[in-house]
Amino acid sequence: MPIAILANSIINPLIFKPEAVKGISMPYIDITTMRGMMPRVVTSMLPEHSAVLAEDCHFRFGVITPERQISGVEKTFTIKPKTIFHYRDDFWFAWPDVVDVIRSPVAQDNYGRIYYTDGKFPKVTAAEIATKGEGNFPAASYRLGIPAPTTAPVCTVQKGEGATDENPNDDETRFYTETFVSAYGEEGPPGPESLEVTVGIPDTPVQLTLSPVPLQDANINRRRIYRSVSGGGEADFLLVAELEASVLSYTDNIPAKNLGPSLATWDYLPPPENMTGLCLMANGIAAGFAGNEVMFSEAYLPYAWPEVNRHTTAEDIVAVCPLGTSLVVATKGEPYLFSGVSPSTISGSKIPSMQACLSRQSMVAMEGFVLYAGTNGLVSVDANGNAALATEQIISPEQWQTQFNPASIVAYPWRGEYIACYTKPDGEKDVFVFNPAGMDIRHLSTPFDCACVDLVNDVMRVVSGQNMSAMAGGRLPSLIRWHSKVFSLPERTSFSCLRVKSPTPERVGITVLADDVPVIHLAPGSLSGSVVRLPAATGQNWQVLVSGFGQVERITLSTSMSELPI
């Protein structure tokens, strides 16, 4: 076979019989695998399995398979949420704003805590207050973090009657401070130290006057008193007593040998009021951001945010997403990668990728990498800091910016794919699905406002308005639309036979076009067998349009029955 004919048969996926060598070509079009769309590629240059339109179908079996319809309404919220979260059992949390939520990293947390940022200030809630009553949940929350006391203890040495300091060398100099403790056992940073206290006679009691706990919503119910102890040339603060928060007076007569552990929460500050983007890394470290500052909590203590655990980026941060013990930080400029086994060892580096993040809600963790909506397409970043424009080969920058409105993307990972709801230029919502393995996209005709992926049951629940349903959770198949590439033949050809392989051909609709003119249109219910005779038609550019509710495994066009491939 001449090289030109062989090359043409590969490029145009037309199988030529040996008679082609003698100048008699008998081609056929045989589509044996089906995939999604690659809008960047000219339709006639697409791979034979690609489509120019793929809607409400998937290709997990390598063929056209209808997605199931969305399920019926499973739950109706009292608000129109922008964020939902499955707390446990039948309890669903919903917020009218974009909210970032994490579960408590504490092992077997008896309180059932979750932590979240909602754009107002960081919060924590627990089962005892979140699920009370009826209506929208969570029913209540506390401000995240424990504030430091603002007033120092007032100290008075209680000298006994007639007691004298006979040995000035045993005088003890002390300072006192206190911390607040929440009902969950979370201890905050210490307040200011007291004035110097000199105890001339050993074990002389010291009377402490404490200030009331300020009005707050941090769930503070206790306070801890510490006093300084010198030893080895260094001073430390050791625990004297733990008191109810309402106690305003205490007498310290505890011998030094009976003091408790040293103060360990010096820098356990509450997170900043404007922190958002809360997420949890694999090593128990929570992360968030505010402006161009990314911050990390102490490990397994999401209420404690030391200032030394903060880092800055050149541009304002748009979104953050954990990958194992690393954190991908997408900004209005280049992305960053922060890594470390503990908060104090975390360091960051800028990733050389000129792709700003255009949508905070577009950033999701896939399997081993993160995807977010960049300037020119979806950007992929892995835990090693390797960045790439994931959709470069299938969507052009112009198509991305004009057709997909990246600033509007709200995305979720499900079944290894990137499910993105966005607003089209005409204001209507649409959904596209990016398959990183297949490197194609497809569309779904079920737009939504927000969603939540249930990994245990492999269900993606979506909310439209106030109603929650399961994506592809219905019993009936969706109406598919799949349009093949345009097969450009070397010369005008007349195909006379159409074969459609399907387990349910009666549920499949087929339209064949020649040079954009319909040759045959078979609505669902018209096919009773697999082979159909085509009306006489000649064309150079052929295309097949699939519709209906049935799976399609193979589509073949041939010039005669005898030329149909096995």
Give short role names for the model-derived ranges.
Residues 121-128, 292-299, 333-339, 376-382, ...:
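Structural motif
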Residues 129-133, 181-185, 230-232, 340-344, ...:
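Short loop/turn segments immediately following beta-strands, especially the blade-tip
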Residues 265-268, 304-311, 347-353, 398, ...:
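A short beta-strand motif characteristic of beta-propeller blades
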Residues 5, 10-11, 15-118, 203-205, ...:
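Beta-sheet repeat architectures centered on beta-propellers
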Residues 327-352:
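Surface-exposed extracellular loop regions of Gram-negative outer-membrane beta-barrel proteins
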Residues 8, 14-55, 59, 75, ...:
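Disordered, low-complexity "stalk" and linker segments at domain junctions of extracellular
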Residues 110, 117-120, 174, 282-283, ...:
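Short loop/turn segments that connect beta-strands within the blades of beta-propeller domains
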Residues 278, 320, 363, 451-453:
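Hydrophobic core register within WD40 beta-propeller blades
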